[in-house]
Amino acid sequence: MNIALKLTLGALAAVPLTCAAQAPKLNCTKDMSYSAEFLEKFPNASAACNEVIEANGQKWVRFNAVVKSREDHHLTVKFIDSHHNAVATMTFSFDPTARVTLDDHQQKAAASLEEGDKLLIWMPESRIGLYAKPDPSQGKHFTLLSDDTNKQEEE
């Protein structure tokens, strides 16, 4: 095979890889549609968003959070924006078998979380629910008990 043909075939093979690498990054405010019900419970959602991806045929938003405390099956976390500022503090209850994803992508039982653990929390655009991964079959729901954001600001 001559050199020109090899170069042409190599360039054509690289085109799909180049296009995939240049797929537009989804934006937290432009590309996510938060429902009114969700925004009522999580008014700082847009500010707390760190990433939006498409997985399993739907958009998922990623929130970063730091564990403030865990007592029994109640978890209080600070949601952190992309500039590392706390934008909300909320308390959730969780199923005893629930698992979470740490910022190093390791899985950990929610019941084993400690103060300072950094979490990656996912939510699908189509419904309210917090998940360890962008896949509803892989995660357990966490139930919002209280939005402590204003209470924390007063302290």
How would you label these PLM feature ranges?
Residues A21-T91, D103-E155:
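Short, flexible, surface-exposed loop segments at domain boundaries
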Residues G10-A20:
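Hydrophobic h-region of N-terminal signal peptides that target proteins for export
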Residues M1-L9:
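Bacterial N-terminal signal peptides that target proteins for export
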Residues T97-R99:
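Small-residue (G/S/T/A) turn/hinge positions that recur once per unit in extracellular repeat modules
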